Amino acid sequence: MRKIIVGSRKSKLALTQTNWFIDQLKALGLPYEFEVKEIVTKGDVILDVTLSKVGGKGLFVKEIEHALLTKEIDMAVHSMKDMPAVLPEGLMIGCTPKRVDPRDAFISKSGASFKELAEGAILGTSSLRRSAQLLAARPDLQVKWIRGNIDTRLRKLKEEDYDAIILATAGLQRMGWDNEVITEHLDETLCVPAVGQGALAIECREDDKDLLQLLAHINDAVTEKTVAAERVFLHKLEGGCQVPIAGYATLTENDAIELTALVGSMDGSVLLKETVVGTDPEKVGLEAADRLIKQGAKELILAANKGQQ
């Protein structure tokens, strides 16, 4: 019986996601056993600086990918939105389980909705994507950076001078906390989700055919297709955490991919947004990127990167 070593970050959410996925594999009843190896990433250690200032995408995966390449672990369970657009040579996303709710969750101290928040209220987020879109809707709000795991951020909302914070609905759902804490879900038209938000990425070595065969049982074709379009868009624009960038794709009734893509200025005064429909994930992602580039997306990205230095 083969033992599969599964790499995971140490946070409660990461371990919850990892154990959930292992349970899906165990339910297949195939002759494998599983062991979780906890790995500390750079993103877990640097908590006093905003993500965008310490290198953005890859912060939560590099050390785990190193463990995959050195064969310390066989596979890793990541949040798809933490994945860089390009993976190291020899590694691949071997499986994308069915995506859960991709929306952002708005959590306010007083129970006020986003529209009802008092003028000048303090909004906690560590995401340039969220802050740009929410400032575009409510320029009067003040954004204050907030870092840490879900539980840390919820504690900071209670104890510190934040009026509201924004978290991913998916993480709260996986922890079973969504009904308890969420004031409202932000509609995708108000705040376009991050590329891959709500989805998991199961990363493994390309040459591990045995494991890839096992993972195929849990793969969700719709999630794979829609997330692929989002990631092609991200790759073409070379967008990481340093840039207000968003991309969310769904499948229409006749199986076409509909991708809404967005790039914004840091302060939300400029939001470029395009929706592209097509059947090929790569073509849809590239088309969305090209349309935004024609509108000046590259200049916005350049300005955002300069602003982070």
Curated annotation (Swiss-Prot):
<dbReference type="InterPro" id="IPR036803">
    <property type="entry name" value="Porphobilinogen_deaminase_C_sf"/>
</dbReference>
<feature type="modified residue" description="S-(dipyrrolylmethanemethyl)cysteine">
    <location>
        <position position="241"/>
    </location>
</feature>
<comment type="pathway">
    <text>Porphyrin-containing compound metabolism; protoporphyrin-IX biosynthesis; coproporphyrinogen-III from 5-aminolevulinate: step 2/4.</text>
</comment>
<dbReference type="GO" id="GO:0004418">
    <property type="term" value="F:hydroxymethylbilane synthase activity"/>
</dbReference>
<keyword id="KW-0808">Transferase</keyword>
<dbReference type="InterPro" id="IPR022417">
    <property type="entry name" value="Porphobilin_deaminase_N"/>
</dbReference>
<dbReference type="Pfam" id="PF03900">
    <property type="entry name" value="Porphobil_deamC"/>
</dbReference>
<dbReference type="GO" id="GO:0005737">
    <property type="term" value="C:cytoplasm"/>
</dbReference>
<comment type="similarity">
    <text>Belongs to the HMBS family.</text>
</comment>
<comment type="function">
    <text>Tetrapolymerization of the monopyrrole PBG into the hydroxymethylbilane pre-uroporphyrinogen in several discrete steps.</text>
</comment>
<protein>
    <recommendedName>
        <fullName>Porphobilinogen deaminase</fullName>
        <ecNumber>2.5.1.61</ecNumber>
    </recommendedName>
</protein>
<dbReference type="InterPro" id="IPR000860">
    <property type="entry name" value="HemC"/>
</dbReference>
<dbReference type="Pfam" id="PF01379">
    <property type="entry name" value="Porphobil_deam"/>
</dbReference>
<dbReference type="GO" id="GO:0006782">
    <property type="term" value="P:protoporphyrinogen IX biosynthetic process"/>
</dbReference>
<dbReference type="InterPro" id="IPR022418">
    <property type="entry name" value="Porphobilinogen_deaminase_C"/>
</dbReference>
<keyword id="KW-0627">Porphyrin biosynthesis</keyword>
<dbReference type="InterPro" id="IPR022419">
    <property type="entry name" value="Porphobilin_deaminase_cofac_BS"/>
</dbReference>
<comment type="subunit">
    <text>Monomer.</text>
</comment>
